[in-house]
A protein has these predicted regions:
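Structural recognition of alpha->loop->beta junctions
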Residues: 140-148, 209-229
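Short secondary-structure boundary segments
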Residues: 126, 200-203, 224
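Acidic, Mg2+-coordinating phosphoryl-transfer loop and its flanking beta/alpha structural elements
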Residues: 177-219
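Substrate-recognition/cap helix-loop segment adjacent to the acidic, metal-dependent catalytic center
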Residues: 46-48, 69-78, 108, 112-122, ...
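Conserved Lys-Pro-Asp/Glu-containing loop-to-beta segment of HAD-superfamily phosphomonoesterases
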Residues: 158-186
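Short acidic capping loops at alpha-helix termini that bridge into adjacent secondary structure
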Residues: 53-57, 80, 143-147, 173-177
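N-terminal helical cap/lid subdomain that shapes the substrate entry/recognition surface
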Residues: 19-109, 117
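Non-catalytic pre-domain segments flanking phosphatase-related domains
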Residues: 2-24
Length: 234
């Protein structure tokens, strides 16, 4: 009788501590798509304004959704019907095969491992569905997640999306972790009270190492192969 009671206590403790869901950013986390995004914005801005913006000008607006970034670059409101969103999607699709032909090596296997461990998988991207969803399909990842939420043109809403995921799945903050590459991902995860794995395996990740470390991520990995073993320990 005592042993059964002890086992119930152990199982209850295990269930309370076990990680239940993993949320992933897309660009720079599941695939090296940041150069693709930057080139899409630069090319379209040049078509519209005649001026090709510098890379830093483009990335300075990251955190906003596609319409938010594009609107800033071409001097238009994100809800302006004339904003060339369709053309942006066209350019993005044209460049995708050459600039981002596949997800990071091991990404598919890692996601399958997370799912096999019984954890839910979510996507939280600052992009909007019209560019995030095509990338997930192109990479063959569209069947490997359970829920997705995207960005807004006026502000970074990843903290709100994390809170939304917890509400949808009835989770506590300790039962969920976010995996993202940008300094803002760390800030947004902390704001939501969620642990953050700073994904530092993209080719350009070292450029933001100082900024990321200054924000004290819970974990920082430079090799995606280390991610699944970490998640299984949490």
């Amino acid at each position: 009788m005592a042993n059964k009671k002890l086992m119930r206590v152990v199982h209850a403790w295990y269930d309370a501590c076990m990680l239940k869901a993993v949320m992933f950013d897309v660009d720079g986390t599941l695939g090296d798509t940041l150069p693709l995004c930057i080139e899409t914005y630069r090319r379209l801005a040049e078509e519209v304004t005649g001026r090709r913006p510098e890379v830093a000008e483009v990335t300075g607006h990251f955190g906003l959704s596609d319409r938010g970034v594009l609107g800033k670059l071409v001097g238009m409101e994100p809800d302006d019907p004339a904003l060339p969103v369709r053309r942006m999607v066209e350019i993005y699709g044209e460049l995708h095969p050459a600039m981002a032909p596949a997800p990071f090596p091991g990404a598919v296997e890692m996601l399958r491992g997370v799912r096999a461990a019984g954890m839910r998988i979510g996507i939280i991207s600052g992009k909007e569905a019209h560019t995030a969803a095509p990338t997930l399909r192109f990479f063959g990842l569209d069947s490997l997640y359970d829920w997705a939420a995207f960005g807004l043109p006026d502000r970074n809403v990843k903290a709100e999306r994390l809170l939304e995921a917890m509400q949808v799945w009835k989770l506590q903050p300790h039962e969920l972790v976010y995996v993202g590459d940008a300094p803002s991902d760390i800030t947004m995860a902390h704001r939501a009270g969620v642990r953050i794995v700073n994904a530092a395996w993209a080719p350009g990740a070292a450029q933001e190492a100082e900024a990321c470390l200054a924000l004290h991520p819970d974990y920082r990995l430079t090799d995606m192969a280390e991610l699944l073993p970490l998640l299984l320990r949490l």
